[in-house]
Amino acid sequence: MIAQNMTIFFWGVCLLTSGWATYSEASVPENLDKSIDELKAYYIKDDHEIHNAHPVFLRVLKDLKVNLEEPEQNLLMSIIMDTYSRIFTRMENDSLDEATKERIAHVQEHLKKLRENYFPGKSAELKTYAETLWAIKEDDPVIQRKALFELKRVYREATLLKNLKNKERRRRQAKNTKNLKS
């Protein structure tokens, strides 16, 4: 359990310190940087598990800007922030060292402010919907029949969303073309 937490924590620290720091306007505040370094010193004793080529968040972040549009990027980042919050809450509850608990709370506070200021929205509501959908029992015959019964309506709704997105894209392209001619 502690080894898993250490791995998760390390990749989180990497995300906070190096991942975001690559953006010119992004940086880790000095007091947060110090807290992260102190937590790393406390939790990370052996780097072996950390460097096992299975990052927790970095693989998702790698393709974030390439594969997703801005609203999707913000939603995903909000979900990542929420995941960090849950990880650090668990670590704080499991810790017996008061100084470590305080450092974790300090990091949590910074993450909370970041999430509130830069990634507000309905991520909690969307996460609830996603969890509900992921919890569906695909092998349940009743669920299978209900899904089949609802498929045409769901398919129509998906098609409407796709068509709306295409119309908006064409509208933007037409506007850009018009602006270029002017």
UniProtKB/Swiss-Prot annotation:
One of its GO terms (cellular component) is extracellular space. Keywords: Cytokine, Glycoprotein, Secreted, Signal. The lineage of its organism: Eukaryota, Metazoa, Chordata, Craniata, Vertebrata. It comes from Carassius auratus. Glycans are attached at N93. PANTHER family: INTERFERON GAMMA. The keyword Secreted applies. GO terms for biological process: immune response. One of its GO terms (molecular function) is type II interferon receptor binding. It is found in: Secreted. It comes from the Eukaryota. Pfam families: IFN-gamma. This is Interferon gamma 1. Residues 1-21 form the signal peptide. The keyword Glycoprotein applies. Homodimer. Its main location: secreted. Cytokine which binds to interferon gamma receptor 1-like (ifngr1l). Has activating effects on primary macrophages and neutrophils. Induces nitric oxide production and phagocytic responses in macrophages. Primes macrophages and neutrophils for production of reactive oxygen intermediates (ROI). Stimulates phosphorylation and nuclear localization of the JAK/STAT signal transducer stat1. Promotes increased expression of a number of genes important for macrophage activity, including the interferon regulatory factors irf1, irf2, irf8 and irf9. Induction: Strongly up-regulated in kidney leukocytes in response to phytohaemagglutinin (PHA). Also up-regulated to a lesser extent by polyinosinic:polycytidylic acid (poly(I:C)). Coiled coil: none annotated. Highly expressed in spleen. Also detected at lower levels in brain, gill, kidney, heart, intestine and muscle. In immune cell populations, has highest expression in peripheral blood leukocytes and splenocytes. Detected in kidney-derived monocytes, neutrophils, macrophages and leukocytes. Belongs to the type II (or gamma) interferon family.
